[in-house]
Amino acid sequence: SGHHDETTDEPSESSKPCCDQCSCTKSMPPKCRCSDIRLNSCHSACKSCACTYSIPAKCFCTDINDFCYEPCKSSRDDDWDN
């Protein structure tokens, strides 16, 4: 499970991994998890994505990283409701 095929086209800006609700433990290194809920898929860098069986499916990434991804909201419109 360590390799993934490079058959997809260049990822677009919108498929960059991002997370608005990220929480980390205070351990070293920190264990960070993104709790964003997305419809039908997880962000592009997610290795283990869990989805509900509803329609549309609500998906979240269960990966544990030692960092948080960039926030999704700020990348598009910085000045809107902060």
Swiss-Prot record:
The name of this protein is: Bowman-Birk type proteinase inhibitor
GO molecular function terms noted in the UniProt entry:
serine-type endopeptidase inhibitor activity
Record-linked PROSITE patterns? BOWMAN_BIRK
The parts of the chain that form a coiled coil are none
Asked if Disulfide bond is a keyword of the record, the answer is yes
Q: Which cysteines are joined by disulfide bonds?
A: C18-C72, C19-C34, C22-C68, C24-C32, C42-C49, C46-C61, C51-C59
Q: Which SMART domains match?
A: BowB
Q: Which organism is it from?
A: Phaseolus angularis (Azuki bean)
CC terms in the record's Gene Ontology section = extracellular region
Q: Which family does it belong to?
A: Belongs to the Bowman-Birk serine protease inhibitor family.
Q: What is the lineage of its organism?
A: Eukaryota, Viridiplantae, Streptophyta, Embryophyta, Tracheophyta
Q: Which CDD domains match?
A: BBI
Q: State its role.
A: Trypsin and chymotrypsin are inhibited simultaneously. There are two separate reactive sites for trypsin and chymotrypsin but they do not inhibit simultaneously.
The portions of this protein that span the membrane are none
Sites marked Reactive bond for chymotrypsin: Y53, S54
Q: Where is this region: Disordered?
A: 1-24
Q: Where is this site: Reactive bond for trypsin?
A: K26, S27
Keywords for this entry? Disulfide bond, Protease inhibitor, Serine protease inhibitor
